[in-house]
């Protein structure tokens, strides 16, 4: 028998990286929020790599912070090393990556949730949703407890019908031998949701004491203090190194000789794996001309000897994994503490979602994270904060928030999922963003703090500091634009010493900065400000001046996109009534139900000719009501 256990505005199911952001975003907006998780000891657990950030993903972490989320602050408090990647490249592809102390990361995040007003944490297994009048009105747990709410966010990760596969051994399990969620998956199918089967994997963990580090290359963190959060003022200085080694021809031979025992090649694994994070057996087969592959040895924390063998994800049998490890320089006598494994799980087809991450089938039900077909902690957290914002706002009777592709990588991620869907675990890449020069690591606050403030996730104090930073950037740009640097003997000598050509005449400081050999520091040596300019302000000034032409071009493209985004498609449109649209396009439009002409144009199978016909139809105002 069921019993009524509580009434909330929002219930979040799952407390992984999507769940914690969803719960915090909801609660911080003033919605009474419950987060239910199978195991309270596994809040924000990292079942795979102990790291946060990297290309595109690191920018998402900063976007989460600019909106008022927690991931950036948490990793700033708990990392063991941090590096800025792609420093030799342009600002569009730079990104932070941090190695986490995974246990401290969990502990700190759980503490944050426990101390958040409006937020209740409970351990429990959700098996069914409460559906009333076609809308989601809460959840029912394994013990019969009914938690009623106005909205529900599912962030179930890889737990839905999870199955661990290791060699010829397979069993029902969530990640890291956690209890899987079987009945909720079956219930979603009963409700009419289309599910797909995906797979991900993890490498073995080895004992640090048994590694011969003299045969590996040290990979230290940056000496310059780094942080993901715009609010971080205290930096961790005692960083731990990672280590680089490589597979050998012997490693590849062992893998080749045991492919018949690999669940990936025996047909035992049915789920589709992530393209951009292949297993070692996949790498050896697909790139058989490569004599070796990189292996990074990453400590899992400060108070453990477990080391994560990055680059060796595998589901080969345990005995093969042991042999394989012993052929890698530095790991000849290594002790394997945990074997690598693959995990299969259910995900929903994400074209069943609106851009708010609410399901089209059941109003009031939102989904975020790996349940939507993505891979990665950062992608999960980015969806989590948006699902939490929108579930909270719906519960409080407020307007939805949708980030566009030109606002944020989070906008690109969600738009790709709900518009194009995915037939493999989706990973965010810089190449997926058309406006990547606008979506930089350095300007996430300038893009999104205003939105975070408007929805109540950014404090008044932080917002004032943000406004001061914006004003300082504009003031310094204006100052440099007004300064003329004259071709004096000293100035000419200085410019020549930097490898630049002499000035023919006086030049604006802003124009001088656009020269490849010049930067903010070198230009302000010739035209110093009255007071020292903060480092983050100087960085913005330099990027905005140096890349002004490219940024301007991107902004013009965004304006064109906005015109298309503003051409809304009424929900009551009947695509069957539009003559001339191709059959495939009609089917896709009916499935995705795009909100705007711009979104319609991004659906695969919808061609420019179909968009032209749709535009004419909309402009003529011939919107037929859907047949009752």
UniProtKB/Swiss-Prot annotation:
| Cofactor(s) needed | FAD
In this chain, NAD(+) is annotated as bound at: 273-287
Where would you find this protein in the cell?
Cytoplasm
The record's section on SUPFAM superfamilies has: FAD/NAD(P)-binding domain (SSF51905)
Q: Which residues make up the binding site for FAD?
A: 14-19, 126, 181, 370
Can you cite an annotated GO cellular component?
cytosol
Give the UniProt family note: Belongs to the MnmG family.
Oligomeric form and interacting partners = Homodimer. Heterotetramer of two MnmE and two MnmG subunits.
* Role noted for this protein: NAD-binding protein involved in the addition of a carboxymethylaminomethyl (cmnm) group at the wobble position (U34) of certain tRNAs, forming tRNA-cmnm(5)s(2)U34.
What name does this protein carry? tRNA uridine 5-carboxymethylaminomethyl modification enzyme MnmG
Q: Which organism is it from?
A: Bacillus licheniformis (strain ATCC 14580 / DSM 13 / JCM 2505 / CCUG 7422 / NBRC 12200 / NCIMB 9375 / NCTC 10341 / NRRL NRS-1264 / Gibson 46)
Q: Taxonomic lineage of this organism?
A: Bacteria, Bacillati, Bacillota, Bacilli, Bacillales
């Amino acid at each position: 028998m069921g019993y009524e256990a509580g009434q909330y505005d929002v219930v979040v199911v799952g407390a992984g990286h999507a769940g914690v952001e969803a719960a915090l975003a909801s609660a911080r907006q003033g919605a009474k929020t419950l987060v239910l998780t199978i195991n309270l000891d596994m809040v924000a657990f990292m079942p795979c790599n102990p790291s946060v950030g990297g290309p595109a993903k690191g920018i998402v972490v900063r976007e989460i912070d600019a909106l008022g989320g927690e991931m950036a602050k948490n990793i700033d408090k708990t990392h063991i090393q941090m590096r800025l990647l792609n420093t030799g490249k342009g600002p569009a592809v730079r990104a932070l990556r941090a190695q986490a102390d995974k246990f401290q990361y969990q502990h700190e995040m759980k503490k944050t949730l426990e101390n958040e007003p409006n937020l209740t944490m409970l351990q429990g297994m959700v098996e069914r949703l409460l559906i009333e009048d076609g809308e989601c009105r809460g959840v029912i747990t394994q013990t019969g407890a009914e938690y009623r709410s106005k909205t529900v966010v599912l962030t179930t990760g890889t737990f839905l019908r999870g199955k661990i596969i290791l060699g010829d051994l397979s069993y029902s399990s969530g990640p890291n031998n956690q209890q899987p969620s079987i009945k909720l998956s079956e219930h979603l199918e009963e409700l009419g949701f289309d599910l797909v089967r995906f797979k991900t994997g993890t490498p073995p963990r080895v004992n640090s004491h048994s590694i011969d580090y003299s045969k590996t290359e040290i990979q230290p963190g940056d000496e310059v203090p780094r942080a993901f959060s715009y609010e971080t003022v205290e930096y961790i200085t005692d960083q731990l190194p990672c280590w680089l080694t490589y597979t050998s021809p012997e490693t590849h031979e062992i893998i080749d000789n045991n492919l018949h025992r690999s669940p990936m090649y025996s047909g035992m694994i049915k789920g589709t794996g992530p393209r951009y994070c292949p297993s070692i057996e996949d790498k050896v087969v697909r790139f058989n001309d490569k004599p070796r592959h990189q292996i990074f040895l990453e400590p899992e924390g400060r108070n453990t000897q477990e080391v994560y063998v990055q680059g060796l994800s595998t589901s080969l049998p345990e005995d093969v994994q042991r042999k394989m490890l012993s052929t890698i320089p530095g790991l000849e006598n290594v002790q394997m503490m945990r074997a690598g494994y693959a995990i299969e799980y259910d995900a929903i087809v994400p074209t069943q979602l609106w851009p708010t991450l609410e399901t089209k089938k059941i109003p009031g039900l939102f989904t975020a994270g790996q349940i939507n077909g993505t891979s990665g902690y950062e992608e999960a957290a980015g969806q989590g904060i948006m699902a939490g914002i929108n579930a909270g706002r719906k519960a409080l009777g407020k307007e939805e928030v949708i980030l566009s592709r030109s606002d944020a990588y989070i906008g690109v991620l969600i738009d790709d999922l709900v518009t194009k869907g995915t037939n493999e675990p989706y990973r965010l890449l810089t190449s997926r963003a058309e406006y990547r020069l606008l979506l930089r690591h350095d300007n996430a606050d300038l893009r999104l703090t205003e939105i975070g403030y408007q929805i109540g996730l950014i404090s008044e104090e932080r917002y004032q500091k943000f406004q001061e930073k914006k004003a300082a950037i504009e003031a310094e740009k204006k100052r440099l634009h007004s300064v003329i640097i004259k071709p004096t003997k000293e100035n000419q000598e200085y410019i020549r010493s930097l490898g630049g050509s002499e000035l023919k005449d006086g030049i604006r400081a802003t124009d001088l900065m656009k020269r490849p050999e010049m930067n903010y520091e070198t230009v302000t040596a010739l035209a110093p400000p009255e007071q020292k300019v903060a480092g983050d302000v100087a960085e913005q000034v330099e990027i905005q001046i140096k890349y002004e032409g490219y940024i301007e071009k991107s902004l013009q493209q965004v304006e064109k996109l906005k015109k298309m985004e503003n051409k809304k498609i009424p929900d009551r449109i009947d695509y069957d009534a539009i003559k001339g649209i191709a059959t495939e396009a009609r089917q896709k439009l009916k499935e995705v139900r795009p909100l705007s002409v711009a979104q319609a144009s991004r659906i695969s199978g919808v061609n420019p000719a179909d968009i032209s016909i749709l535009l004419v139809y909309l402009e003529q105002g011939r919107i037929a009501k859907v047949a009752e």
